[in-house]
């Protein structure tokens, strides 16, 4: 027999009630309201009634005078004309869960109800605080949230802030402008990017879903904690699964960044909070912009794309380098990528362009290394910067061909050890799911060239992962039998296949580690351990003697046995020197100290010490030649 109170009318009467009643009465009302759900519903139905109605426990609908006031020819303090109600926008349904900030009503001395315009901001909060004896604005706002009926209920926002598991899903920011469109981003054109660390916001009115496992810092300024004029809607469920580098690039950030979008009349504090939510979605932003200086990320290919001559120089330097890219990517295959990017730049942009950027950056880095010191330090810094620019698209590794995976690992090895480790993990996971088995349907649709490159790419990954894991003191993940294909044979264009040489070195190193440092090896007898030690040394020496003739003396420390005059082959020579002496250190150095007593005989301990000393002498001799003054003239004295 009694209609439910309108949510807007209840809000107006609540403000009036807060300013007209004493602190003791308000405290009692709050306790009485939160005591039970049933009592709160009973209070909310007659909270808007005047004092006379309350004294008689008469329920007042707030729109027309109650029966008691009509009977005694009185006027309700909460009365509003029907004309004023029809001119207001309708209250949203419960499914939409949209609440409108109402206008404030006050009663003048003559008993006539007047309408006070609602402020556009929440600067009325200090006045509300002054009317409360405790001065706790947060409690006032809780009362405001509780002062609703059961149909148009508003959640208590401030209670959720006290928990670490912050969930703002029941919160909706609403202002007085009911026609304001919610903030949304049209990301329909980004569907081809693969799995992103967020779901695109919806473009229609819907219930927000902000389930972010990060506590949000809240300011003590209550005026910055309430919504302003326009409605703000986010639908960004964050998936905690996946690698930590599930990233987006700078161009995506420019599209979804709140600073680049109109957020209505949100306060600066609220805008900072929204921006912090976006930045918490990924920690990639700082790493992608690291080392770029003033360069624009979305134009990191501009330095070479319009310069055909520079592209040819970088490409030639990249594929002339016997180690790295040329071991698993042919120049003709790369030329097809370049032509595809020029003819249809939007089709394979995420896969082809990062590949081209990486090859160009790697080639420029080689050119800069060859021209030193005549080129100066500026060229060297520019080469490092361009390598970092190519690395900034490394999140595309998960959605790129396998060739790009290994390519970006090669570049990252020159720059950042941490990034290199992460890319190796991505590549191993990807390669294990695509092992190019004979039973795989993809194998039947592969061209001969792509099948050849796929095999070499997987073995190149093996050669990198084994050495990298052992350097970090971890057992290798990949083994020589991890794929159905045998080791690559001699390359097509040269008698020396450097990929085969790298894989043989990885095999020798992995075999030595398993024979000497595995859990089973630690339980061996002294004779078995010494036999395995000599067998590991024999495998390493067999690898050294299989190198080209000019590299077979990398174990000697005498001057003249290692040629470093040629700038084009110096990096290759030093790489082979490093691989050999690093293996000597891994095999023998742990047995040179007193801690090996009882594990090997004294003869083998001294033999290990002798090999390590000779290895150190050879490395120091080469380092002295490199750092000598002769290198400043562009050549090294033999």
Curated annotation (Swiss-Prot):
Tell me which residues form the DNA-binding region: 50-76
Q: Which PROSITE patterns match?
A: ZN2_CY6_FUNGAL_1 (PS00463), ZN2_CY6_FUNGAL_2 (PS50048)
Keyword terms, alphabetized: DNA-binding, Metal-binding, Nucleus, Transcription, Transcription regulation, Zinc
Q: Name one GO molecular function term.
A: zinc ion binding
Q: Which gene encodes it?
A: terR
Q: What name has this protein been given in UniProt?
A: Terrein cluster-specific transcription factor terR
Question: What phenotype is described for loss of this gene?
Answer: Impairs the expression of the terrein gene cluster and subsequent production of terrein.
Q: What turns on this gene? A: Expression is induced by methionine. Nitrogen starvation induces expression of terR and promotes terrein production during fruit infection, via regulation by areA and atfA. Iron limitation acts as a third independent signal for terrein cluster induction via the iron response regulator hapX.
Q: How is it used?
A: Terrein shows anticancer activity on various tumors including cervical carcinoma, ovarian cancer, and head and neck cancer. The secondary metabolite acts as angiogenesis inhibitors through the inhibition of angiogenin secretion. Terrein also has anti-inflammatory activity. It shows an alleviative function of age-related inflammation characterized as an anti-oxidant and might therefore be a useful nutraceutical compound for anti-aging. Terrein may enhance osseointegration by decreasing the level of ROS and has a potentially synergistic effect on osteoblast differentiation.
Compartments annotated for it: namely:
Nucleus
What does it do? Transcription factor that regulates specifically the terrein biosynthesis gene cluster. Recognizes CGG direct repeat consensus sequences in the terrein cluster forming the high affinity consensus motif TCGGHHWYHCGGH.
